[in-house]
Amino acid sequence: MNSTPTALLIRWAVPLTAAVAVLSAALLLGGCASPGQLPPPLPLRSATSVGWLASTTASTTARTTASTTASTTASTASSNASEATTPFPEPQWWRALGDPALDTLVERALSDQPSLAAAAARLARATAATTGTQATQGPQVGLGLDLSRQRYTEHGLYPPLLAGRVYNSGNLQASASLELDFFGRHGAALQAALGQQQAARVEVQAARVLLAANLAHAYVSLARLVSLREISLRQLDQRQALLDLTVARVQAGLDTVMEQRQAEGSLPDTRAQIEALDGQMALLRHQLAVLSGQAPQALDGLSPSLAPLRSAAPPERIGADLLGRRADLVAARWRVEAALQDVALARTQFYPDINLIGFVGLNSLGLDRLFSIGSRNLGAGPALRLPLFDGGRLRANLRGRAAEADLAVAAYNVALLDAAREVADAAATWASVARQQDQQARALAAAESAHDAAGQRYRAGLGNYLAVLSAETAVLAQRSQRADLQSRALDNQVALMRALGGGWHDEPAVRSVR
């Protein structure tokens, strides 16, 4: 019997009307479902709250408190996280130190260090998760084929035609489904995944800055020890000369054996200092080699000097734009964004899950009829899932996500305070070391002047060589102190560059540390 167009219209209109009615009821029930009230959110601190002049605006809202404000709060966090778009400092910020050997080591480290490979792997994992989340938002289409040979029991509910007989059966079916995202579930899930992906991306930059800073610190420390060793070698020669002079004076009856023994005791002490410096230098060479992705003994011949290293003037103004470029702060901000979206996602679980499903295929008992016109099988309609009674599971999940958002906000606030402290410490140390260097330069000049005067008196026959050696002792002590202050100044410069995320854009007034 052929169906008329009117009959077909009536046949499909009835179930579609029922489906619309069910869908409307689901939306009504979903609108009545309440996730309850959440505790007040933690405030997200801004750079101005820690005493820095801000050039960007940061949000003070941590997470959503109602479904109507979820997207607004997430957008605010997104703008907060958009400070990540502030350009990072010069990628090769360590070049400001002016040592080509250090540049080579850092560049090798950034290409071969396993710790960076781990950060890149975490980024790849987050990217894959984002791709997977995106893939679930479109139509899902599948194709299945089931073939079986079955003997039907004689004592079951099968009709006599089947009972006790063996038949082949086949089912070839294509199916499709599409989730209707009326409540922002897909968007929240995608934004949460994107937040984690962006955090992982920025953490790669943070790992690069940290690696370069650690390598620069070790390099400066090694250069300091090399300088101190050179001074110690000169002290050894000077004390040997002092011992020789003392022995001669004892033989001449001008000094006692006590002075000779004192001079003899200074030699082993100086040699022990040199051995200690050699041991520390070996450890630093091993550290530099491993940081640059090499075997520990690869840099056993490395002996850098403080002379070529340069110290740059600090920025006149450290604003929020500088502090906000720190990769770890940017990553923490993205973690907050992801956590906020997780809260929004947990809230959507209270609303209906509505899908459109459909299938078309062939099904028959007996493979010889599988592809006949009468074996066709098709269907379509909505599928709805609505949580009604779950023992508080969804509310617990929502509160857990809200707590995780608070944890992310707290972690960001702690990181911001730590960053501000690191910058403040570096700035204060910079000024203190600069004042110490000025005073030490005067002390060194005075010691060198006294040494020159003692030498002139000795050459003029007005003084003895013992006075020259004694004056040189003060000069060597001041040179050791100068090396210490030089390395402290360079170390502090690296610390400030790392604290600001890798330097600053201001054109530095570069001066030698010598």
What are these regions (language model features)?
Residues T60, H186, G195, V202-I318, ...:
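Periplasmic alpha-helical coiled-coil/stalk elements that build and connect Gram-negative outer-membrane
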Residues N2-L9, L16-S111, G170, L194, ...:
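Terminal intrinsically disordered/low-complexity segments used for targeting and assembly
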Residues L356, L384, R401, A408, ...:
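Hydrophobic, well-ordered secondary-structure elements that form the walls
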Residues V250-L254, Y458-L462, A499-G503:
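A short glycine-centered flexible hinge/capping loop motif at secondary-structure junctions
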Residues T256, A419, A426, N464-Y465:
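Alpha-helical heptad-repeat coiled-coil segments that mediate oligomerization/polymerization in large
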Residues S34, G51, T60, T72-S75, ...:
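Small/polar-residue-enriched beta-strand and adjacent coil segments characteristic
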